[in-house]
A protein has these predicted regions:
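ADP-ribosyltransferase catalytic core
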Residues: 51-121
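C-terminal catalytic or substrate-handling cores of phosphate/nucleotide-
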Residues: 128-131
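ADP-ribose/NAD+-binding catalytic cleft of ART/PARP-like enzymes
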Residues: 1-62
């Protein structure tokens, strides 16, 4: 998954934080729950996790189990709801699916870093103006 993550970060042009994490995006419900089960709290400051062994590591199974994250364009096109910025430790990345132009991934843990209130809070190609 190391090479897959490098491809994801390179193609998505997402920032790496001073402490070695990277930032990515996720679309959640209006009340900050995950869109799949509506049971995981994705409000700012929350840490969301699941056992790593339950995250599908097969990149050719593109829609599968795991905590999903994405590049800005992919996440923002994922229907209605709130767009949140995730802070992810690279060690928690399990797979980058092969057929989405390296724009989405699966991990076992992330921290909800912030909420994107409008595109005005973004600069560049998906970079967050403050992190």
């Amino acid at each position: 998954s190391v090479n897959e993550l490098y491809e994801f970060l390179e193609s998505s042009r997402l920032p790496i934080t001073d402490d070695g994490y990277f930032l990515a995006y996720k679309k959640v419900t209006e009340d900050f729950k995950d869109k799949h089960t509506r049971s995981m709290d994705n409000s700012v400051g929350s840490t969301v996790s699941m056992p790593r062994r339950k995250v599908n590591d097969n990149r050719d199974q593109t829609c599968s189990t795991g905590l999903h994250f994405a590049a800005y364009n992919y996440a923002n096109s994922f229907g209605s709801g709130k767009l949140v910025v995730l802070k992810i430790n690279p060690k928690d990345v399990v797979s980058i699916p092969s057929d989405y132009n390296n724009e989405k991934g699966r991990c076992c843990e992330y921290i909800v870093h912030s909420h994107v209130e409008s595109e005005d809070t973004l600069t560049g190609k998906g970079f967050v103006s403050s992190y």
